[in-house]
Amino acid sequence: MLDESLEPGWLSEEVKTGTTIIAIEFDGGVVLGSDSRVSAGETVVNRVMNKLSLLHDKIYCALSGSAADAQTIAEMVNYQLDVHSIEVGEDPQVRSAATLVKNISYKYKEDLSAHLIVAGWDKRGGGQVYVTLNGLLSRQPFAVGGSGSSYVYGFVDAEYRKAMSKEDCQQFVVNTLSLAMSRDGSSGGVAYLVTIDEKGAEEKCILGNELPTFYDQ
């Protein structure tokens, strides 16, 4: 057995997504995005984790905080939504998914360390983005989270406009992620995007060398 004094520090550190996550509404749907870096302490343990987790066919969540805790919440909600849709015979509402995330997060707030942004499309409300944190449930036109969010608040406030097109929202998400990944040591890797509308969900991965650069990079 390895002497504890010789063990690398990351073996005893909690694995966290660090992360930058974002979601934004457009007329007819939503776009979610995230970086892909996962760290334990100062060590990067996964460079390409997809932090956009499927909750139902047209509902996703973006994960931040403890990787294990965030994935556990997402899997619990995914299971409950599947059961619900079978029982009622129709797809669940985005708000219902967000409420489940909120309830689980609040019930186990002393044990879990995770923040999820829930976004998707349903026939009643169209594209929707919800913030869930410590029992809070709030619908927003866009939301950012994770350690990288503090580096991009000024950028998103300046660049966001009402009634942006799907293509504009996709570029907005890519630019925000690229800026955060260039400044936040806990964000990096590739950028994952998912665009959701009435037709379904379209996933995309953008490699690091394909991301836009800024003047100081």
Swiss-Prot record:
The gene is psmb9. It comes from the Eukaryota. Autocleaved. The resulting N-terminal Thr residue of the mature subunit is responsible for the nucleophile proteolytic activity. Its EC number is 3.4.25.1. InterPro entries: Ntn_hydrolases_N (IPR029055), Pept_T1A_subB (IPR000243), Proteasome_bsu_CS (IPR016050), Proteasome_sua/b (IPR001353), Proteasome_suB-type (IPR023333). The keyword Membrane does not apply. It catalyses: Cleavage of peptide bonds with very broad specificity. GO terms for biological process: immune system process; proteolysis involved in protein catabolic process. Its main location: cytoplasm. This is Proteasome subunit beta type-9.
